[in-house]
Structure formats: structure tokens, C-alpha cells
């Protein structure tokens, strides 16, 4: 069975890992980095992903960041003169990860396990699967990020019984999961979180502070200047990282904008104390999900054996202190917060292929599922933190006499009223025989698969007629849209490959022209004019082809030049070899004469 890669598709950074033997290994990107920025840029028709895209974010307005925050919505992003769905942009990131994983493995990769925040709803999970499909990946499993982290942490501890709390603060989302590990079983007891809290929010607090201070001093609002804002974002992210290691950092942005008197510069120092003050409310928001998860799991703090930190934002000192204060435990530092999720995803890939044995992963659904019943009430069929996959049925009836049909309004959430929860979909069961209200028996069944994807069935127990849907949120993509996007992605891949081929050919032509001109100059007056003239003629023809830009002509003329240049090189080599031989012959004769003289002298010394 081919390898299944593990992908952590993050808000700010992504990572890819693969199982090698029993070890999960992070695959470095072409720039040698173990994580890749989740950034996509468009330039001159080319799609640029990762570090290169992030570097040009300041100057290139066609740059997309933090697309994960839009997954599962109908919101599109404009770039490159087009509109893209979040799934399409995410697919470009996935294609890039897939590409360098294939380069590392030396084989095609067609399957992946992709992680999502534990608190992702059905629409967001479906969007992630769709992105994988567009990227040419069969998504074998969608795994919750904290669960994947626990899997990576606990792989070498399958003989121990432990209860662990995973605190996962990423770039755009926050999750807390509590798991029980024992005899190779990873059982998720509870999960809680906040889909709108992450490292980006900490960056934003610094940006807001810098904008306010600059406006106070100069009367100019930098938030209205797109290029200045991007520079502020980069500076804020760097300052946040610096303050994890030092207590004060300098923010210096020369020529940030211009005033009536000329250019203006931003020079400010930011202390850790000030940063903590700016972000106090964000740190405070991490506490409620921790308490909620413990309550749902029915555990006290004293029953937690280990606390695992996941996500780059858990390096913020105030966050670490808050975790210590809330759990009463020193966090375990044995895992890399940036890499552990992708490593866990690769282990789950190994479980699927059978390369990892004696490991069972029991995940849960993060939010309750149910339907709207009379009076706009949300009636739950599956409670949050139910182990998946699962199935649950409940019998309902009609609300009016002779009601011919029932509308099934499928919802996800925790609020008591339907209007306050997330609509997953609607469908109708029709042709119900006329009967007084409360008589027809309508059985509604919810199924959640291993990926957390929901399907719902309604059945009239009297007529046995049923309706069945796999939930596709209004923001989801149709099969036709996914197919079109897959074709677009394939077409782009071909175009990118062709563009690279063109660049490689042009570079080869430049190199050949340079090398041949050098050789012709070096061989001037050395006697092989026929070969030199032939090489010069081929060189002139290649230069003309280069000028015209005709790729086929360039290819043909390059081959011709290589042939003539080779003939000239052979003559040069032959001449050099002959000269070397002649020189060695002269040295040999001289050595013989010298040896004869030495014999005479030695004879004199040996005479007694």
C-alpha cells in the first residue's frame, strides 16, 4: 500500500509528515524549513506558495493569508483578477505540501490524513475534504488536531495509563481536548474550544497599538494604507516571537508613510509587560474552554497526568503561565508544538495502512447534533463529546392533523433554540398518509462517520418511505464544482511545469552561449579553425533563436551548438594531451641522462 502522508493544514503555517518504519518524520520544504507558511501569492500568472509567497506579501496585493479562517463559509477571496473559494486556496497549499513530499519520497502520493481544529463544524470539515480532493488527494481521515498531537505524544507510552490535557493554540483557532491513554487506546473524553481565537489575534493587538501610537504622534492612520498594514503585520508577528525570549523588543519601520514634510518612520519599543497588558483579554479567553472540557470529561485537575502544549502561540510566556495557573501543572515540553500535529496525522496514516499496530483512536464529535421541533426548539439526537463513528435514532410525529409532509431542519450547536444554532441542511419527507396529529411515526436517524461528516435519514415507519441526505452545508461545494476545481488545479500544474521547462531551457541557452564564447576566445590562433568556425556559426544561430523567443527553435539550435562545441572541445583536449605527452617524453629523456651520471658518481663512492 502506498504511503499516506499526514498534513497539518494550519491558519498561519502548515506541515507534512510521513511514517518511516515506526517513526513519524517531518518533511522539510524546498527551502529547508520544517513548516511552510499557509500563504498563496499570484504573480504574472504564476501561483507561489509558502515562504516565497510570504516574503512578497508586503509588495504583492495578490497575496492570500489565513484562508483557514474562511473554510466552511461562502466567502470568496479576490486575487489575480479572479475570485477563489477557500477550498481552492487551501488546495494550492495542499498541492505544494504534496509536491515536496513526493520529491522526498521519490513516489506519487495520493492519500493523506488531514487535521482540523477539534471545534470545526460539519461545513468546515467537508470544506477541508473538498480542498484535499481538488489537490488530488484522497483524504483517508479527518483527525482533530489535539487528538493527532496526543497520538504523537503517546506513541511510545502505549503501556502506560494516562489522562492528558492537550492545549492547542494555533494561528487562528483554539482547542482543548482531554484524552485517556491506555493499552494503545487513545480515547477522547471531551473537547472544547474557540474557533475565533489564535496567534493572529495576538498580532492584531500589537498592530492596533502601533497604529494608535503612530496616529497620536503623526495624525496619520496607517490602517488605511494597505502596504503599510502588511509591514505592520510582519513587524507585529516578529515582535510577538521576540517577546517569547526577551523582555523588550524594538520595532523599526523606516519610510512607513509620508507626511506633508516628507517621509515618516515608525520607531517604537514594546515591552513584554505592555504586550501582556494588550493581550490580557485573549489569554483570559483560553480559560473557559479548559474548564468546560474538564467538566464534560467529569474529571478534576488532580486527575490530569500531563498537559501538552500545541501550536506556536503556546510559546507566549503569558499563555504558558495561564496554563500553569489553570491546571496547576508544569506543561510537558517533550513535543515540538509546531510539528506534533502533522506527526500524529502521519501516525494515523500508519494505523490505516497497517504499519502501526495495536493503536486505536476513539475521537468525539465537538458539537451536539439534532433537529428543529415544534416551537423552534432544538432537539438533540447526538450530544457533544460522543465517540465517533456513531448512529442515533429517535421517533417524532406530525404537529398538525392530516399533515402531508415534514420538514427536517438539521442543526449543530449547544443553544436550546434552533435559531441560535448552525444550520447544516434541510430536507423534506413527503407523502405521509392523512392521519390525526401525533399518529404518524417518523424515525429520524443521525450518522456521523470517522471524519465527523454527518448524514441524516427520515423514515415513515407506516409506509417505510424514507429520505436520506449527506449533509452539505449551503457553503459547501457541489461535485461539479469540485471536479471543475480539480481540473483547474491539474491545468495549473501542467502550466507551471511548462513554465519551469521554459525557464530551464532559457537558463541552459544562456549557459551554453557563455561557455561557447569563452571556449572560442581561448582557442583563438591555436590551429583548429574549422571546428571554431562551425561552433561560431552554431552560436550565432542560437543567439538569433534566443532573440526570437521561439522555444522549439532554441531547443534545436542548442542541440546543434552542443554538438559543435563538443567537437571543438575534443580538438582542444587532443592538442592538450599531445602537448602533455611531448612534455613527459622530454622529461623522461632528461631523467635517463641524469640517471646515467648518477651511476658514475655512486661507483666512485663504493670504491674501497
UniProtKB/Swiss-Prot annotation:
The keyword Phosphoprotein applies. Keywords: ATP-binding, Chaperone, Nucleotide-binding, Phosphoprotein, Stress response. Induction: By stress conditions e.g. heat shock. InterPro entries: ATPase_NBD (IPR043129), Chaperone_DnaK (IPR012725), Heat_shock_70_CS (IPR018181), HSP70_C_sf (IPR029048), HSP70_peptide-bd_sf (IPR029047), Hsp_70_fam (IPR013126). SUPFAM superfamilies: Actin-like ATPase domain, Heat shock protein 70kD (HSP70), C-terminal subdomain, Heat shock protein 70kD (HSP70), peptide-binding domain. Disulfide bonds: none annotated. The modification Phosphothreonine is found at residue 173. Residues 578-598 have a biased composition (Low complexity). Residues 578-608 are annotated as: Disordered. Pfam families: HSP70. GO terms for molecular function: ATP binding; ATP-dependent protein folding chaperone; unfolded protein binding. Residues 599-608 have a biased composition (Acidic residues). HAMAP family: DnaK. Acts as a chaperone. Belongs to the heat shock protein 70 family. This is Chaperone protein DnaK. It comes from Streptococcus pyogenes serotype M2 (strain MGAS10270). The gene is dnaK.
Amino acid at each position: 500500500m502506498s504511503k499516506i502522508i499526514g498534513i497539518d493544514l494550519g491558519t498561519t503555517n502548515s506541515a507534512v509528515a510521513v511514517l518511516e518504519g515506526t517513526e513519524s518524520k517531518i518533511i522539510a520544504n524546498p527551502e529547508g524549513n520544517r513548516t511552510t507558511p499557509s500563504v498563496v501569492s499570484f504573480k504574472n500568472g504564476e501561483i507561489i506558495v509558502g515562504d516565497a509567497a510570504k516574503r512578497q506579501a508586503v509588495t504583492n496585493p495578490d497575496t492570500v493569508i489565513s484562508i483557514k479562517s474562511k473554510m466552511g463559509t461562502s466567502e470568496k477571496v479576490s486575487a489575480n483578477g479572479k475570485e477563489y473559494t477557500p477550498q481552492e486556496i487551501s488546495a494550492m497549499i495542499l498541492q505544494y505540501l504534496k509536491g515536496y513530499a513526493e520529491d522526498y519520497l521519490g513516489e506519487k502520493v495520493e492519500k493523506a490524513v488531514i487535521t482540523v481544529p477539534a471545534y470545526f463544524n460539519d461545513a468546515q470539515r467537508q470544506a477541508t475534504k473538498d480542498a484535499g480532493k481538488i489537490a488530488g488527494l484522497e483524504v483517508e481521515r479527518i483527525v482533530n488536531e489535539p487528538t493527532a498531537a496526543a497520538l504523537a505524544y503517546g506513541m511510545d507510552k502505549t503501556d502506560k495509563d494516562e489522562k492528558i490535557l492537550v492545549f492547542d493554540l494555533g494561528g487562528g483557532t483554539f482547542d482543548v481536548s482531554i484524552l485517556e491513554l491506555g493499552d494503545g487506546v487513545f480515547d477522547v473524553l471531551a473537547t472544547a474550544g474557540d474557533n475565533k481565537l489564535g496567534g493572529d489575534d495576538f498580532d492584531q493587538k500589537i498592530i492596533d497599538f502601533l497604529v494608535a501610537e503612530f496616529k497620536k504622534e503623526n495624525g496619520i492612520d496607517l490602517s488605511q494604507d494597505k502596504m503599510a498594514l502588511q509591514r505592520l503585520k510582519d513587524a507585529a508577528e516578529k515582535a510577538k516571537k521576540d517577546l517569547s525570549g526577551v523582555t523588550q523588543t524594538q520595532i523599526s519601520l523606516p519610510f512607513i508613510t509620508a507626511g506633508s514634510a516628507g517621509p515618516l518612520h515608525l520607531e517604537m519599543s514594546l515591552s513584554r509587560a505592555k504586550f501582556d497588558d494588550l493581550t490580557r483579554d485573549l489569554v483570559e479567553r483560553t480559560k473557559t474552554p479548559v474548564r468546560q472540557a474538564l467538566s464534560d470529561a467529569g474529571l478534576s485537575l488532580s486527575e490530569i497526568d500531563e498537559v501538552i502544549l500545541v501550536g506556536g502561540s503556546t510559546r507566549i510566556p503569558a499563555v504558558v503561565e495561564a496554563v500553569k495557573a489553570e491546571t496547576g501543572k508544569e506543561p510537558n515540553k517533550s513535543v515540538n508544538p509546531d510539528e506534533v500535529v502533522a506527526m500524529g496525522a502521519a501516525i494515523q496514516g500508519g494505523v490505516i495502512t497497517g504499519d502501526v499496530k495495536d493503536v486505536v483512536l476513539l475521537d468525539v464529535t465537538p458539537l451536539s447534533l439534532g433537529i428543529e421541533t415544534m416551537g423552534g426548539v432544538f432537539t438533540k439526537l447526538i450530544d457533544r463529546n460522543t465517540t465517533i463513528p456513531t448512529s442515533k435514532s429517535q421517533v417524532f410525529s406530525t404537529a398538525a392533523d392530516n399533515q402531508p409532509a415534514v420538514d427536517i431542519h438539521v442543526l449543530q450547536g449547544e443553544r436550546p433554540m434552533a435559531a441560535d444554532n448552525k444550520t447544516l441542511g434541510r430536507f423534506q419527507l413527503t407523502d405521509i398518509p392523512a392521519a390525526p396529529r401525533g399518529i404518524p411515526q417518523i424515525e429520524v436517524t443521525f450518522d456521523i462517520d470517522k471524519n465527523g461528516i454527518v448524514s441524516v435519514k427520515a423514515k415513515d415507519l407506516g409506509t417505510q418511505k424514507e429520505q436520506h441526505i449527506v449533509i452539505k452545508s449551503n457553503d459547501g461545494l457541489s461535485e461539479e464544482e469540485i471536479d471543475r476545481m480539480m481540473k483547474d488545479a491539474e491545468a495549473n500544474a501542467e502550466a507551471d511545469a511548462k513554465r519551469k521547462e521554459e525557464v530551464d531551457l532559457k537558463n541552459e541557452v544562456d549557459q551554453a552561449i557563455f561557455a561557447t564564447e569563452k571556449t572560442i576566445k581561448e582557442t583563438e590562433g591555436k590551429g583548429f579553425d574549422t571546428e571554431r568556425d562551425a561552433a561560431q556559426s552554431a552560436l550565432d544561430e542560437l543567439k538569433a533563436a534566443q532573440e526570437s523567443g521561439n522555444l522549439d527553435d532554441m531547443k534545436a539550435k542548442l542541440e546543434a551548438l552542443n554538438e559543435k562545441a563538443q567537437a571543438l572541445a575534443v580538438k582542444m583536449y587532443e592538442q592538450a594531451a599531445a602537448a602533455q605527452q611531448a612534455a613527459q617524453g622530454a622529461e623522461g629523456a632528461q631523467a635517463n641522462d641524469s640517471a646515467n651520471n648518477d651511476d658514475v658518481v655512486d661507483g666512485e663512492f663504493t670504491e674501497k
